[in-house]
Amino acid sequence: MSINSVLTLLFCYTFLLANSNLVSAQPFDYPSANLSTSWTNTPSAPHSVQFTDGSLIRATLLRGSFGPKFACGFYCNGKCDSYLFAVFIVQTNSGSGIVQPSIGFPQVVWSANRNHPVKINATLQLTSDGDLVLRDADGSVAWSTNTAGKSVAGLNLTESGNLVLFNQRKAVVWQSFDHPTDALVPGQKLVAGQKLTASVSRTNWTDAGFYSLLVNSRGLFAYIQSNPPQAYYEKIVSGSDTSRTASYIKLLNGSLALYIHSSEPGEPSETIPIPQALSAQYMKLESDGHLRVYEWQSGWKQVADLLTGFYGECAYPLVCGKYSICSNGQCSCPGSSSSGARYFRQSVEKHPDQGCTEITPLRCSGSKKQRLLEVPDVTYFTFNSSIGNTNVERCKQACLGDCSCKAAVFRYGSDPSNGECFLPKEVFSIMDNDKEKTHYNSTAFLKVQNRR
């Protein structure tokens, strides 16, 4: 080999070595798709990853590399006989490969078909006329953006986790941020008219869960499903409107900002503090009613529990199940009457947190055999006064005279003849009344059915 050839090879080797960082920095992510693109949910699909917590993903789009990044695709957890099309956060390496299956479990922050999960061989298609359609294995439509004929040019997953259909001018035609499910990511809004709805459980994703979070012109509210819904969290924001836009909340780095009477670029009406994010972060309304914030810290860690405030865990509607009494985190059924009669038993034996069941169910036709079981020194997580300026006897009689009433909750300050009465139509968990916190006296009277 000539000296010139050796020098040429040496130069090429030196050049490649010096520029190896440039080679490794080339983008390997796949954040967008053109029209007439389709993906099929099969075991052989590319970018499939099984995690040790039982979850599995088949990514269709992924944005970014090295660290926690957003991806979307098919997701399942558990038996994996049904799948969501979802946006989730995963851990990636410098080549945009999905890594850390033992700790970097996918965190779902949006889903399209939570009420209509699909099976193996389901397809996702970005059609030639601009519709994004999810079809189950049998060809039935599980979900669609309904954007056919709206000049869609392509699909993009943004760095903030927003799944966007855009037109030739790059303007948004449809975006997942306008259709929140049970979570918000930084920069995302929840606008009046929208709501977050908790899933039933970690593996039952349907929005038939008990809890919802919404914002309106009065503030931020969390409800448990009932008829009517019962609020277990209220953040009332006073003030006069300085904005013509609808009220909204926005998840920011360091706070949940409440734009109730204002809008950006102005200051929020109020904020709920959240620890500053050092990595990926998101907020989720979960199946137990908690609104938790999670952050990646070499594993997903809870960094805030936003609704657990002054009254603690016992203020959650189903912390002890229906009719059960929560006292310092312990659950128990209401005791016997003064005559020794028992009216409640544990719904699930040896599981007091699963609630209590009436031994004899209430019947409107048997109202003459109904009475009220007094449970002293307890209160309820919500109080929507049904009767004001009243006394305990009028409160009790109002419940006995109303078939739909399941309990009478009476409370007063210093004058028992001038109290308030709440008549819930459904009874969830009851809690001890800590007078040092509530500054009122409170008693519950549970409507029960005599057996004879």
What are these regions (language model features)?
Residues S2-R452:
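Beta-rich ligand-binding surfaces for carbohydrates and other polyanions
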